[in-house]
UniProtKB/Swiss-Prot annotation:
This is UPF0145 protein Bphy_3680. It comes from Paraburkholderia phymatum (strain DSM 17167 / CIP 108236 / LMG 21445 / STM815). InterPro entries: UPF0145_dom_sf (IPR035439), UPF0145_YbjQ-like (IPR002765). Pfam families: YbjQ_1 (PF01906). Belongs to the UPF0145 family. PANTHER family: UPF0145 PROTEIN SCO3412, UPF0145 PROTEIN YBJQ.
Length: 111
């Protein structure tokens, strides 16, 4: 498994040299809101502020997509991912796709 400090939103890893680019990797998750969750979130909007039900749903979806991307990179033999990004698209009413993607690389520590 790829160590968390070996994932970067930039295209370099401080203290490391990229030896090989192994290709694009991604993790995709599709989530829907439950009826109960939608009602609870609707009640929270009345009072304003953070809608905690949606926040936790979004955090969980991003974490799951991230884990899938790391597994994809590990299958290619990567020990790092650079240029990592998230994207989200609403597919339908209450259904959202979360994509986590980046470039799988093999990097070595500078001596």
């Amino acid at each position: 498994m790829i160590e968390r400090h070996m994932v970067s939103t930039t295209f370099d890893l401080p203290g490391h040299t990229v030896d090989a680019s192994l290709g694009m990797v991604r993790g995709i998750i599709v989530r829907s809101r439950s009826v109960v969750g939608s009602i609870g979130a609707g009640l929270q909007t009345i009072f304003g502020g953070n809608i905690s039900l949606y926040t936790s749903l979004c955090e969980r979806a991003r974490q799951d997509a991230y884990e899938r991307m790391l597994a994809d990179a590990a299958m290619l033999g990567a020990n790092a991912v650079i240029g990592m990004r998230y994207d989200a698209t609403e597919i339908g009413a209450g259904v959202t796709e979360v994509l986590c993607y980046g470039t799988a690389v093999h990097a070595r520590r500078n001596v």
